[in-house]
A protein has these predicted regions:
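Bacterial N-terminal signal peptides that target proteins for export
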Residues: 2-16, 25
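Periplasmic alpha-helical coiled-coil/stalk elements that build and connect Gram-negative outer-membrane
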Residues: 2-3, 7, 137-251, 262, ...
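C-terminal segment of classical bacterial N-terminal signal peptides
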Residues: 20-28
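Bacterial Sec-pathway N-terminal export signals of envelope proteins
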Residues: 29-76, 109-110, 225-264, 311-312, ...
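Short, charged, amphipathic alpha-helical segments
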Residues: 121-124, 187-198, 323, 389-397
Length: 472
């Protein structure tokens, strides 16, 4: 496995990170950031482990295809007892024969029109397709970590806003009660304030429950409980245009690359099946030694032969298999077209969502500023008797709504940014430069692609790799 050094963040985020470190407390230094979440998910994902094992199983199909082009050598030992009774001039004769035979046989496919070689190429393309599918799974796992992290951050911000809202409403309730005692407001004003406090308390309880649920989801995805959230994650570099994003996706998206390799594998498989209709040539050889256990003579046998065979009629099974493989090839080509369109649509949707989230964040920021000014003014006017309690409560609700919208827009922007990265096929541990040991699919493949025998040194190396993978 190769070690990938983490990439450098943009200068903006480096400066922000430096300020955070300078102003943070010792407890904040232990906060979990988005990279921690993705690293945890990458290291502990059972889904990734499952698909890595499936990839290793697919690697073995290449070894099986290679083995078809090699000679097959068998060794056999046979102990036999033969009884023979036959007529003679004077009656019947009984004969017992006991023998022990040992022999070696060899069979080697010399020619099959290239069918076995095409099967090997199909297996190699299937391996490449499965590797890309594994990368697609990796993207899904990492995006799940992004969603879990951003949701925890969103719920924490929501709890903070509603806690502050409850505090302000309690202050307003006390103010309404004081003004009621001096006759400035009626009991209705106090009841309105009490109702808003009760509603805010219920909303806060709901938000706290949502936060606990978000933390539980985070632990499920990342594999460890979250401590303190470090804050807003750095956003990926902004793409120049929708066309640029689509161009990157068409070159890099693993699901699209997987389909392309699947089409090539289907082409080789169809060609291999067509070759099976032709003749094949095999070399056969054997050597043996027979021991007569009854005291007779021992004997040695050996022989070699070339066998040219051609199936003349098989009930139509070979032709049916060829047509089926051609149909599967057509199906893979259709799936490739569908995948291309799906990738293009996903890029467009993510790009539009990101642009909308950015615009929404700007608008909600302006809304918060205006709502804060309005709330401060109305609250001050209420102390002078120019505004009612209901005016203050409505202004507070508008401020809370604006702040909540800004928090949601910020979360939507982060999710859309990483969703666009995923849609382009770039949400991988290697591209992000995560400080983890990147899983190298070629390590196992290079050990098995030549179908090593059990007694070879490569087979022993392979056993060590299998044990190491089993411990991970």
């Amino acid at each position: 496995m190769r070690k990938i050094s983490p990439v450098k963040f943009p200068k903006t985020f480096v400066c922000a990170g430096a300020m955070m470190v300078a102003l943070s407390t010792p407890q904040a230094a232990k906060a979990d950031n988005l990279s921690d979440a993705m690293i945890g998910a990458y290291k502990t994902s059972g889904l990734l482990e499952q698909n890595r094992a499936l990839l290793r199983a697919t690697d073995e199909s290449v070894a099986v295809a290679v083995a078809r082009l090699r000679p097959i050598v068998d060794f056999a030992v046979t102990a036999s007892h033969r009884y023979n009774r036959g007529p003679t001039t004077f009656g019947f004769s009984d004969t017992d024969t006991n023998t022990l035979e040992a022999g070696v046989s060899l069979e080697w496919l010399l020619y099959d029109g290239g069918a076995s070689r095409l099967s090997q190429l199909a297996a190699q393309e299937t391996v490449l397709s499965t590797r890309q599918s594994l990368l697609d799974i990796e993207q899904q796992v990492l995006f799940s970590a992004v969603q879990a992290y951003v949701n925890v951050l969103l719920q924490q911000d929501t709890v903070r806003l509603r806690s502050n809202n409850l505090r302000l409403l309690r202050e307003e309730l006390r103010a309404a009660q004081d003004r009621f005692e001096v006759g400035e407001v009626t009991r209705t004003d106090v009841a309105l304030a009490e109702s808003r406090v009760a509603g805010a308390r219920a909303n806060l309880t709901q938000s706290q429950g949502d936060l606990l649920e978000a933390k539980a989801t985070y632990q499920q995805v990342v594999g460890s409980p979250i401590n303190v959230v470090a804050g807003q994650p750095p956003l990926p570099q902004r793409v120049a245009s929708l066309q640029a994003a689509e161009s990157v996706a068409m070159r890099n998206h693993p699901s699209l690359l997987a389909r392309q390799h699947a089409v090539k594998a289907a082409e080789h498989t169809a060609a291999s099946t067509a070759k099976n209709l032709g003749p094949s040539l095999r070399l056969r050889a054997d050597a043996g030694h027979s021991i007569n256990l009854d005291g007779g003579r021992d004997s040695d046998t050996s022989g070699v032969s070339l066998v040219l065979s051609q199936r003349l009629y098989g009930g139509g099974s070979l032709a049916a298999a060829r047509r089926a493989d051609v149909a599967r090839l057509d199906a893979e080509k259709g799936a490739l077209i569908s995948t291309q369109r799906s990738v293009s649509q996903a890029v467009a949707a993510a790009y539009v969502s990101l642009e909308a989230a950015r615009a929404s964040l700007v608008s909600s920021g302006e809304q918060v500023r205006a709502a804060q000014v309005a709330f401060d003014g109305i609250r001050e006017e209420a102390t002078l008797g120019a505004r009612t309690t209901l005016d203050v409560l409505q202004a507070e609700q508008e401020l809370l709504n604006a702040q909540t919208a800004r928090v949601q827009a910020r979360a939507n922007q982060a999710l859309a940014a990483y969703q666009l990265l995923q849609a382009q096929g770039l949400l991988t541990a290697e591209h992000l430069g995560l400080a983890v040991e990147i899983y190298d699919p070629t390590l196992y493949y290079n050990l098995v692609k030549d179908a090593p025998a059990n007694v070879s040194q490569r087979s022993k190396d392979l056993d060590r790799v299998m044990k190491a993978l089993g411990r991970n």
